[in-house]
Structures are given as C-alpha cells and as structure tokens.
A protein has these predicted regions:
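A short beta-strand-loop-beta hairpin characteristic of the jelly-roll/cupin
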Residues: 89, 95-111
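A short hydrophobic beta-strand segment most commonly corresponding to one strand
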Residues: 90-95, 114-116, 129-149
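Fe(II)/2-oxoglutarate
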Residues: 1-3, 116, 156-157
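Non-heme Fe(II)/2-oxoglutarate
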Residues: 1-64
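Structural/interface elements that position substrates and couple domains in central-metabolism enzymes
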Residues: 66-68
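Conserved metal-binding segment of the jelly-roll/cupin
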Residues: 107-128
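Low-complexity intrinsically disordered segments
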Residues: 144, 154-155
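Conserved short histidine dyad/triad with adjacent acidic residue
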Residues: 70-86
C-alpha cells in the first residue's frame, strides 16, 4: 500500500544542527540569482556542499541522480512571487532562522520548518516580515512522490 501524503508539501521531522547551518550561512558570500536573463532582487543563494554533509543527506534521503545543496536568502519585506523552480522536481527545505513566512501553492498555504516540497508546481513565499534563510537540497532527477515515499518508508513506518 502506498503511503498517503499531501500533494504539494510534506512536513518532516528531520532536524540538522540549525545553529551550525545558520553560522555557516552568515559566513558565505551571497550570489545574485538570474531568471530569464534578469537579476532577481528577491532571491540570493550560496552553494554549501561539504562532503560529510553531502554523504549524510544522500544516505538519509536515498537521493539519486543530480542534486545540490545551498543556502537560500529571501530578503525582509521581499516577496518571492509565483514561480516553478528552474529544472528541479522537488526539494528538501529547512528554515534555519526564525522566519515565519509561508509557502503558498495555488490551492493552499503551508507553515513549516522542515519539509519536502514539490518544486515542479507553481508556488510563492508570502509574509516575509524578516529575512528568511533556508538550507535547501534541490533535486533534478527525483520526483516529489519518489522522495516522499522513500522518506516515509524509511522514517515513518
């Protein structure tokens, strides 16, 4: 029997050392993000792929194919409008500061601190009262359903 889960976002109980990640995020130079040839002022990122963490994440989530890890910075008072992530099918997002912003899909809003998201569907980030900093694992070759099923079968059953 297939596990049942929400069609857009699966909150997960998977906490890395957020204090350590937050310290690392603050040390990294932020890179500008370009979409359709235009610089975005509402999204910055910093690659972060130490081997020990890559190995741990890959084994914990059973990641296959292409994926990467990075910090994502969404500025205070900003708004990350409706979009589909470029080329990725899903992601694992951990909010590493105390941001209370929500992610919204066309049919529902979600509050989360750690979650698997379907990035192949249109979504946006709303209520950015303060800066939002994420540790994000982006997956190009695994679908949201595949990643959720692996996580549930490994950690929930």
């Amino acid at each position: 029997m297939q596990p049942k889960f929400d069609k857009n976002l699966l909150p997960i109980a998977f906490d890395l050392d957020k204090e350590y990640l937050f310290e690392q995020a603050l040390k990294r130079p932020r890179k500008k993000f370009y979409f359709e040839g235009k610089e975005r002022s509402d999204y910055y990122y910093a690659p972060y792929e130490p081997e020990f963490l890559k190995k741990y994440i890959q084994e914990a989530f059973g990641l296959k194919g292409r994926w990467n890890m990075k910090f994502v910075y969404l500025p205070a008072s900003g708004k990350l409008d409706w979009h589909i992530d470029k080329g990725t099918k899903c992601s694992i997002n951990l909010v590493i500061n105390n941001s209370r912003a929500q992610v919204e899909y066309r049919d529902r809003r979600y509050d989360y601190t750690s979650a698997i998201l379907d990035t192949s569907k249109e979504h946006r980030v709303v209520n950015l009262a303060g800066e939002r900093i994420l540790f994000k694992v982006s997956c190009w070759d695994m679908t949201y359903d595949e990643l959720c099923n692996i996580f549930i079968n490994k950690f929930v059953k």
